[in-house]
Amino acid sequence: MPKATCSRGTPGYKPGDERVVEREIQEAFAAHARDRERVEGMVVSQETRHIQFVATLSHALVGPGTRMSIAIDVVPRGGIHVYAPGTPYRAAAITLRPNPCLRVHTPVYPKPSVHLFEPLNEQVLVYSSPFRIVLDVTAGDTDAQRAELRTRSWLDIEGTFDYQACDSAVCYLPVSIPLKWTVKLQHSSV
């Protein structure tokens, strides 16, 4: 899978690193397209006027205590930046619908860069090159969650990928894209 993005100011950054990361993410898009039948339902991909993204769930079969990762690889279009956490605007985020069977962990974000939005003379945290957000969830992490899992054969994981994008002159309206995965539950025979 693609690596997290490097930005100027990141230790070890070399000019051109963004192109390497972008190529890796583009290759991941192609690999996801080839593997779609094999992992049917585990990949959500979409293009908007601002970005391309692929959202992947790591497991199709889970049992109590299984920790899964939701990874979203995002490629902003040329001249576009996406707000990062720590700004007063709609930052890129994975938001999951509450589910009595899941424990949601803290998301992992790459380091953003500081961007001067000249029309407002405002410094904001953004992603302007390819980046990845990872959110882990655990199925049946507590006794109550395991009891709920025993009543089911399938587990739906639903939510949204939310973001707000801008170019050098315009901040576009926030976008919320639905995400949904259905995983099969494996119950222990003990």
Question: What are the residue ranges of the model-derived segments?
Answer:
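Extracellular/lumen-exposed scaffold segments
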Residues: 6, 10-190
